[in-house]
Structure formats: C-alpha cells, structure tokens
From Swiss-Prot:
It comes from the Bacteria. One of its GO terms (biological process) is regulation of division septum assembly. The gene is minE. Prevents the cell division inhibition by proteins MinC and MinD at internal division sites while permitting inhibition at polar sites. This ensures cell division at the proper site by restricting the formation of a division septum at the midpoint of the long axis of the cell. This is Cell division topological specificity factor. Keywords: Cell cycle, Cell division. The keyword Cell inner membrane does not apply. HAMAP family: MinE. It comes from Photobacterium profundum (strain SS9). Belongs to the MinE family.
Amino acid sequence: MALLEFFRPKKTTTASVAKERLQIIVAERRSAGQSTPSYLPQLKLDLLEVIRKYVNINPDQVSVNLDQKDEDLSVLELNVTLPEDK
C-alpha cells in the first residue's frame, strides 16, 4: 500500500497553498527594502485613541517601532510615557 502512495501526487490543501503564498508575499516585501510597514502610523493613532480613553496624553508621548530581529522574527515595541498620579 505504501508503494502506491509513493507514486500518487501529493494533495495540497488550501491552507498549505495560502501559507505558501503568504510566505512569498512576505519575502518579496522584505527583499523590496520596505523597512516599515504602511500600517504603523495608523496603528499608532489607534493605540493613542485607546490610551486617551483612560489617560490624558499627547501624541509625542507614544512611540511605536517595528524591529526586525532576524529573517523570521519581528518585534513590535510600544513605549508610552504616562503622567504621574498626583
């Protein structure tokens, strides 16, 4: 039975095809030299809006950075300077 399975073509699932396509897109973006994703400015504004619901802060008190540690690891860093309670 194993011999017959050897000659059959492997069936690809839609998940494996989607994963492969996503890996190609990510590799193309990395090779194109796109240092920061286009969504970071909007992400910063959204985070600022959420933080302002609880604390009164200025936009310059929030920084969002995306660091590429190695080929398959990225770190999203969020720094918020909160005012002191009085």
